[in-house]
C-alpha cells in the first residue's frame, strides 16, 4: 500500500502501481521518462518545475493541473491533447486511475489563497486511495478527506506545521501517513520525526525522506 510511494524530495512524490504517477516533480536526480501521469498541485517553483517535468515525462504522459495554471502551461512541453485542467471537486479517470481534485489553501496566510483554486489530489489506483495534500492548512474541506494513505505537508510557514498535520491525520485517520514538504524549502529536517512521534500508537507513519 505505502511501499509503492516514494518521496523523491520536498513534495515531489512518485507512486508506482498499474500506472506510474508523479506529483509536483522537483529536484529529480535521474531522467526516467517513465511517467504515465503527472499531477501538479499549483504553480509555485517548488511544485511546477519545467526542468523536472522534462526529466520524467515522455510522449504519452498526461499532465493534470489546476485550471488556474492554464496560461502557465505553454512551456510545459505537453500538448493540450495530453493536458487535463481541473478545479477543486473535479473528478476524472485516466487509464483506470481515478483522480479527484480537492481544495488546498491556507487559513490566515497569503501564500495559497482559496480563490486561486489550487488543489491537492485523491488518487485511487489498485484499490488504494492516496491523498496528496498539496500546500494546505487544516480547513473545513480537508477535514472531510477519506483515504488509505495520506501525504501531508509538515514544514510550516507555507503549510501546516508537524503538530497541525498530526492533528489533521487524527481527524481523517488514514491507514498510513507520510510527511512531506520539510527539510529544504521549508521546515526542519526533524519535522518528519516530530510528526511521527505525535502519532505514535495512533497511525502508522512512514518516513520516506
List where the protein language model places each region:
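Binuclear metal-ion centers of metallo-dependent hydrolases, dominated by the metallo-beta-lactamase
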Residues: 5-6, 77-93, 166, 170-209
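Redox-cofactor binding/interface segments in oxidoreductases and associated redox assembly factors
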Residues: 23, 39-40, 100-104, 152, ...
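Metallo-beta-lactamase
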Residues: 122-175, 179-188
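Active-site metal-binding motif and surrounding structural segment of the metallo-beta-lactamase
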Residues: 26-72, 146-151
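Core dinuclear metal-dependent hydrolase active-site scaffold
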Residues: 1-33, 85-146, 160, 209
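Short, acidic/turn-prone active-site loops that include or flank metal/cofactor-
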Residues: 27-28, 44-45, 68-70, 87-91, ...
Amino acid at each position: 500500500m505505502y511501499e509503492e510511494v516514494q518521496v523523491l524530495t520536498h513534495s515531489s512524490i512518485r507512486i508506482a502501481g498499474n500506472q506510474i504517477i508523479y506529483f509536483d516533480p522537483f529536484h529529480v536526480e535521474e531522467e526516467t521518462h517513465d511517467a504515465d501521469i503527472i499531477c501538479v498541485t499549483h504553480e509555485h517553483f517548488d511544485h511546477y518545475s519545467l526542468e523536472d517535468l522534462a526529466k520524467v515525462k515522455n510522449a504519452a504522459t498526461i499532465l493534470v493541473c489546476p485550471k488556474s495554471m492554464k496560461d502557465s502551461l505553454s512551456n510545459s512541453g505537453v500538448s493540450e491533447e495530453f493536458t487535463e485542467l481541473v478545479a477543486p471537486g473535479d473528478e476524472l479517470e485516466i487509464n483506470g486511475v481515478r483522480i479527484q481534485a480537492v481544495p488546498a489553501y491556507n487559513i490566515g496566510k497569503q501564500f495559497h489563497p482559496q480563490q486561486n483554486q489550487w488543489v491537492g489530489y485523491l488518487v485511487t489506483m489498485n484499490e488504494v486511495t492516496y491523498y496528496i495534500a498539496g500546500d494546505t492548512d487544516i480547513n473545513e474541506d480537508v477535514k472531510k478527506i477519506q483515504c488509505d494513505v495520506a501525504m501531508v505537508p509538515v514544514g510550516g510557514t507555507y503549510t501546516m506545521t508537524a503538530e497541525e498535520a498530526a492533528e489533521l491525520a487524527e481527524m481523517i485517520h488514514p491507514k498510513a501517513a507520510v510527511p512531506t514538504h520539510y527539510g529544504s524549502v521549508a521546515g526542519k529536517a526533524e519535522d518528519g520525526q516530530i510528526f511521527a512521534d505525535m502519532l505514535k500508537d495512533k497511525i502508522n507513519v512512514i518516513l520516506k525522506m
